[in-house]
Regions:
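Structural helix-boundary/capping segments
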Residues: 15-19, 27-30, 35, 77-134
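Serine-dependent amide/ester hydrolase catalytic core
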Residues: 1-78, 128-133
Length: 134
């Protein structure tokens, strides 16, 4: 709710400037797909925090989990790209994940790579009681 209120308070000129930046950023990111089929990026900078802990460490300092957990996912959502996030296997911690990013219309490439990563044992995490069933 607080983010919606903050957005509603933006002046029109700021909104127009943000849309210009979004178009420019979209062009830059789409150009990357002339060289590669899929981009791979971390989903978050650290393991997931416990529900009762509202902070994470950012640059060695405690910071708001809510304000900082989306730092790696939000920029890739801005240009409207298809993104698939998947958990890494056997990290020994709370979930860590990867983002697989493709050009619009190339969602099949994301699913194909995710399946290969899972088959190689690099991705895919199951609750303890489901591990034998998988």
């Amino acid at each position: 709710r607080d983010r919606l209120l903050a957005g509603a308070m933006l002046p029109a000129s700021t909104y127009v400037q943000a849309q210009r930046f979004r178009r420019w950023f979209r062009e830059q990111v789409h150009a990357a797909f002339e060289q590669v089929d899929v981009l791979i990026a971390p989903s978050v900078m650290c393991e997931a925090p416990l529900l009762d802990n509202p902070t994470i460490m950012v640059g060695g300092k405690p910071a708001s989990a809510r304000a900082n957990l989306g730092l790696y996912t939000q920029p890739l959502s801005l240009p409207g790209l298809p993104v698939l996030c998947l958990p890494l296997s056997n990290t020994g911690t709370l979930p860590l994940g990867l983002q697989l990013v493709a050009a619009p219309g190339r969602e099949a490439a994301l699913f194909s790579l995710a399946r290969k990563l899972e088959q190689a044992g690099l991705a895919g995490r199951y609750p303890h009681n489901m591990q034998q069933a998988a």
